[in-house]
Amino acid sequence: MEILYFGVLIFAALAGGKLAEKMGLSNVVGQLLAGIIVGPAMLNWVPSLHIIHVIGEYGVLLLMLNAGLETDVKQLKQNMKAATYAAVLGVVLPLVTFPILALMFGIQLQTAIFWGIVFAATSVSITIAVLNEQGKLASTAGSVILGAAVLDDVMALLLVAGYAMFIGGSGLGPDSVMPLVAFGLGLLVRRWSGSSHFLELSNSIGKWTLFPIFFGSIGLMVSFDNFWNEAVLLVILTIVAVATKYYGAGWGAQLAGIGKTDSRAIGAGMISRGEMALVIAQIGLSTKIINHMEFSSFVIVIILSTIIAPIILRPLLEQVTD
């Protein structure tokens, strides 16, 4: 029976991803929504089984390994100053704002800090697609976004590791540090001449099995219990998630000497949360730092930010310099 559940989840996630792409959305959004639809929150075709989440964890590790394999350290040298400023301010602003917001809602300090870490992470997979679509990937804005995204991912992982030290190891165990290890391993393997073939193979394996299981399993954990009671919080979280990245990364780029128009595009390009934020949120749930209600809210906000980002970015890219 478990094999059947896996089959349904993978099929639904892959189909959802394809449908999302046709609608101009991120593949990840489609897979997440598919998990929500077939999971306990809606159709209840696939229960939230422990084995599904265990296999999904391997998807996380492969995802982070591939992130390391795809990270071009040389890319950081191009527009390094602007990328650094955009990444740092784009991380600092949500890292400060979300804990304050959480404390206002009565969340304990330890958990409030984790809120900031979750929303400090950025995913630019959808941004890269939009940049490619409009031929702006090699533009100044495109280059800064790519460089900032690399730094952003590294900082997000370091924040998780630092948080583990902050709480004295009581919440995050060795399993929680494994994504960081996988990312580092990817960076090392990238130096090998055959790394491109290895990346192609691991991407193929992940694309058809582990990735849809991971993203689909995230959807299985979403609950709409007390959804309407949390509607105001969801709206606030989404607005803050969009604003902190847009203004944080945008201001950072401007401080580095990038023009206002390009800086706005850079800010918009950093709005989307995705894989990294989901990985961090998953760590928080599995280690009981956040509860299921918070986790569900985070997933919904991550989905909304991924949908909103290209809507803001597309018109701004038409104005940027090449």
Segment roles from a protein language model:
Residues 1-9, 48-65, 109-125, 174-185, ...:
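Structural signature of hydrophobic alpha-helical transmembrane segments
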Residues 1-28, 170-178:
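Hydrophobic transmembrane alpha-helices of multi-pass small-molecule transporters
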Residues 9-18, 35-36, 40, 58-62, ...:
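Transmembrane alpha-helical segments of multi-pass membrane transport proteins and ion-pumping complexes
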Residues 19-27, 37-82, 176-237, 258:
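Membrane-interface junctions of multi-pass transporters
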Residues 31-41, 64, 85-99, 147-161, ...:
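Small-residue-rich segments of transmembrane alpha-helices in multi-pass membrane proteins
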Residues 73-78, 128-173:
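Alpha-helical transmembrane bundle and helix-membrane interface signal
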Residues 81-136, 229-320:
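Transmembrane alpha-helices that form the ion-translocation and gating core
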Residues 159-173, 220-232, 281-292:
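Transmembrane helix-loop junctions at the membrane interface of multipass transporters and ion channels
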